[in-house]
Amino acid sequence: MEMAYWVMVMMMVWITAPLSEGGKLNDVIRALAPDDVTPQFILRSLISRRRSDSDVREVPVCSWKICPP
């Protein structure tokens, strides 16, 4: 338990130290994530994992409780 406390304290110091040197919070937060993790990268990886259109079944759209056969 004591080890977890010190790990937490050191992480807080590691995150807040650049702020005391004049850094901006946004820059500190961005430095915590790897450079290749961007919204564009995440979107591309999600699209590449998506099944092809032939695998996706079309669900009939029902309007006014009348569904196509």
From Swiss-Prot:
Tissue distribution of the protein: Expressed by the venom duct.
Positions carrying D-tryptophan: W64
Principal location listed in the UniProt entry: secreted
Positions where 4-hydroxyproline occurs in the chain: P68, P69
GO cellular component: extracellular region
Disulfide pattern: C62-C67
Compartments where found: Secreted
Sites of 4-carboxyglutamate modification: E58
Extent of the signal sequence: 1-22
Propeptide position ranges: 23-57
Gene Ontology MF terms in the entry: toxin activity
Domain notes: The cysteine framework is C-C.
Function: Moderately activates human somatostatin receptors (SSTR) with a preferential activation of SSTR1 and SSTR4. In vivo, does not cause behavioral changes in mice within a few minutes of intracranial injection, but causes a progressive loss of movement thereafter. Four to five hours after injection, mice recover, even with the highest dose tested. Shows antinociception and antihyperalgesia activities in two mouse models of acute pain, most probably by acting outside the central nervous system.
Family of this protein: Belongs to the conotoxin C superfamily. Consomatin family.
Additional remarks: This peptide is an evolutionarily optimized stable analog of somatostatin. In addition, it adopts nearly identical conformations as in the somatostatin drug analog Octreotide. As this drug, it contains a D-Trp at the same position, whose synthesis is a common strategy used for enhancing the metabolic stability of compounds in drug design. Consomatins evolved by gene duplication of a 'Somatostatin and related peptides (SSRP)' gene expressed in the snail neuroendocrine system.
Protein name in UniProt: Consomatin Be1
Species whose genome carries this gene: Conus betulinus (Beech cone)
